[in-house]
Amino acid sequence: MALNQLSLSLQFARDAEATAHRATLPRHAVARWIRHALAVDAEITVRIVGAEEGQRLNREFRHKDYATNVLTFDYQQEPVAVADLVLCAPVVEREAREQNKTLEEHYAHLLVHGTLHAQGWDHETSEQDAQEMEAYETAILQELGFADPYAA
């Protein structure tokens, strides 16, 4: 299977919570996970942040006053997808622990999830859209050697 081209910028905020995850997110792995979710070529910035920045961005752009796991800012979907994916390290770590997953597994899932959002996928419009997106995420992650992220 030929994968689409990816121009990737990987950033870690100057925050102890974010930089602690640097070893879990080698550039080659992040690029591989994202490329498997791409239907078009892409220019994507991935930024790993701490709780404070995550909460501020979620409040500012989604009007929700808490840090969330991943925020996708999609600027263009065609002919090249252009987006920023912001992942909040302490939220990802807490969720991974609660779901009995490794950090790597959860980051892979959230990066695939965010990449699909960057290409127009949406799980909040209808139950059918949510099911289709979850099924596609699961297929991509299984291709990458990860378990179904939605399995109980």
Swiss-Prot record:
> Where found, per UniProt?
Cytoplasm
In Gene Ontology terms, what is one molecular function of this protein? RNA endonuclease activity
Please give the cofactor(s) recorded in the UniProt entry for this protein. Answer: Zn(2+)
For the ligand (Zn(2+)), the binding residues are: H113, H117, H123
Give TM regions. Answer: none
Q: Name one Pfam family in it.
A: YbeY
Q: Which GO terms describe its cellular component?
A: cytoplasm
Looking up PROSITE patterns in the UniProt record yields:
UPF0054 (PS01306)
Q: Which UniProt keywords apply?
A: Cytoplasm, Endonuclease, Hydrolase, Metal-binding, Nuclease, Ribosome biogenesis, rRNA processing, Zinc
Q: Name one GO biological process term.
A: rRNA processing
Give the enzyme's EC designation. 3.1.-.-
Q: How is the cofactor bound?
A: Binds 1 zinc ion.
Primary site of residence: cytoplasm
Instruction: Please give the function described in this protein's UniProt entry.
Output: Single strand-specific metallo-endoribonuclease involved in late-stage 70S ribosome quality control and in maturation of the 3' terminus of the 16S rRNA.
* UniProt similarity note: Belongs to the endoribonuclease YbeY family.
Protein name (record) = Endoribonuclease YbeY
Species lineage: Bacteria, Pseudomonadati, Pseudomonadota, Betaproteobacteria, Burkholderiales
